[in-house]
Amino acid sequence: MSSAAGPDPSEAPEERHFLRALELQPPLADMGRAELSSNATTSLVQRRKQAWGRQSWLEQIWNAGPVCQSTAEAAALERELLEDYRFGRQQLVELCGHASAVAVTKAFPLPALSRKQRTVLVVCGPEQNGAVGLVCARHLRVFEYEPTIFYPTRSLDLLHRDLTTQCEKMDIPFLSYLPTEVQLINEAYGLVVDAVLGPGVEPGEVGGPCTRALATLKLLSIPLVSLDIPSGWDAETGSDSEDGLRPDVLVSLAAPKRCAGRFSGRHHFVAGRFVPDDVRRKFALRLPGYTGTDCVAAL
């Protein structure tokens, strides 16, 4: 087994982790989609294409009112929370990461999963979305999923370093490189969480390793969950959606961004029930109704 993106697999503990996953775990069973057998991989790809050919709910109500946020509005809302409400940055990242993990459990409930389906590859970038991904991975471990993190371009930011330490202390594996053999990833993991790019972050800003990782993620046939926006998309228009990732699940953080109007995957959640009512009114947000004490709502 070889990889153009890394060292000799015979010397790589990460590759042995993939092999152990293949030896110990049964084939991926139905996750509300076609079974990912040799025949069903094609079936899932076809379903994904069919879903993306439909007009999304958000696109239908695009002109009905301010459901989606522009990048500037999202930044202004965050400033309002940080400066006026005295939220801490780490607090917001924690709230979003926890809610993202809850959204994953809603889309892929643990009792319905086989052991293999519980394995989750979380791919993190060096900006704030990557920090949310690190928190998401930690909470997935608490929820008894089996996350592994690929974090190719590590940020020197103290928050990122602290979150990385927390994951390491909880024995969450980190991959030093991502194999280029797509089928190896398909067979080793039940799903992938995309926390690579966030609103306003271009692929070129995060370095070659992240760009190469996105190219690999585009080829996967296992379910893909994107946090806030699908990596590679223009946050305003979704105009790069043809070249960016096409997730099966989108988890919008706090409120959907404008590009979410182009999302036509299987599940769309709004995660993070922390926006105060007067802030919601100030920014004219029409957020979904949450059930009980849930921090996640399905659209």
Curated annotation (Swiss-Prot):
Q: Would you tell me the Gene Ontology cellular component terms? A: mitochondrion
Which keywords are on file for this protein? Answer: Lipid transport, Transport
A Pfam family of this chain = YjeF_N
Name the job this protein performs: May accelerate cholesterol efflux from endothelial cells to high-density lipoprotein (HDL) and thereby regulates angiogenesis. May orchestrate hematopoietic stem and progenitor cell emergence from the hemogenic endothelium, a type of specialized endothelium manifesting hematopoietic potential. YJEFN3-mediated cholesterol efflux activates endothelial SREBF2, the master transcription factor for cholesterol biosynthesis, which in turn transactivates NOTCH and promotes hematopoietic stem and progenitor cell emergence. May play a role in spermiogenesis and oogenesis.
GO MF assignments: NAD(P)HX epimerase activity
Query: Cell inner membrane: present as a keyword of the record?
Result: no
Source organism per entry reads Homo sapiens (Human)
State any GO BP term from the record. Answer: hematopoietic stem cell proliferation
Taxonomic superkingdom: Eukaryota
- Which residue ranges does the record assign to the YjeF N-terminal domain? 74-287
| Name of the protein in question | YjeF N-terminal domain-containing protein 3
Q: Please describe the organ and tissue distribution of this protein's expression.
A: Expressed in theca cells in ovary and in Leydig cells in testis (at protein level). Also expressed in brain and mammary gland.
State the organism's lineage.
Eukaryota, Metazoa, Chordata, Craniata, Vertebrata
Oligomer and partners: Interacts with APOA1. Binds to HDL.
